[in-house]
Amino acid sequence: MKVGFIGAGKVGCSLYDYFVHNNIPVTGCYTRTQAKVSGTEKQTQKIFTTSIDKILTKSDVLFLTVPDDAIAAVWELVKTYPIQGKFICHCSGSLGSAVLSGIEETGAYGYSIHPMFPFKGKKTAYEDLAQALFSVEGNEEHMEEI
């Protein structure tokens, strides 16, 4: 499965690095900030884009790694795209998968995947993620795949 991200903060960047270092294909990370695209990409070897289409079309799994209070709004945007069969996940510790309202109608599968882990920064947090515990809640039918 190919993984993409919306949101380039500590959680998104740390999970991105963890997946890459563990040979899980990552399609890139959507960010609203053009400066992040042009500057950080060269330093970190991450693929950033300001085109949500690029991330959505290439990804089987999409992580919404945005602040908790932005998840619902980002989801409202994501669900306007053809996402049938995709796994849509957020990493909030305070919100369940129900924040992805109407996901059944899109044909996608929703999950809350919360790492019980202190993300100290974008550059090194991924190194200790193998020891982290995760709570996973969402679509029961595809739980083993996620």
Give the role of each language-model region:
Residues 1, 86, 132:
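Nucleotide donor/acceptor-binding cores
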Residues 1-50, 54:
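NAD(P)+-binding Rossmann beta1-loop-alpha1 motif at the extreme N-terminus of oxidoreductases
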Residues 9, 34, 68-69, 93-94, ...:
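Alpha-helix N-cap/helix-start capping motif
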Residues 27-31, 88-91, 136:
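Short, hydrophobic beta-strand segments that form beta-sheet elements in well-ordered domains
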Residues 29, 125-144:
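Short beta-strand and adjoining strand-loop segment in the mid-core
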Residues 35-39, 96-99, 141-145:
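Short, charged/polar "capping" segments at the starts of alpha-helices
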Residues 44-124:
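Rossmann-like NAD(P)(H) cofactor-binding subdomain of soluble oxidoreductases
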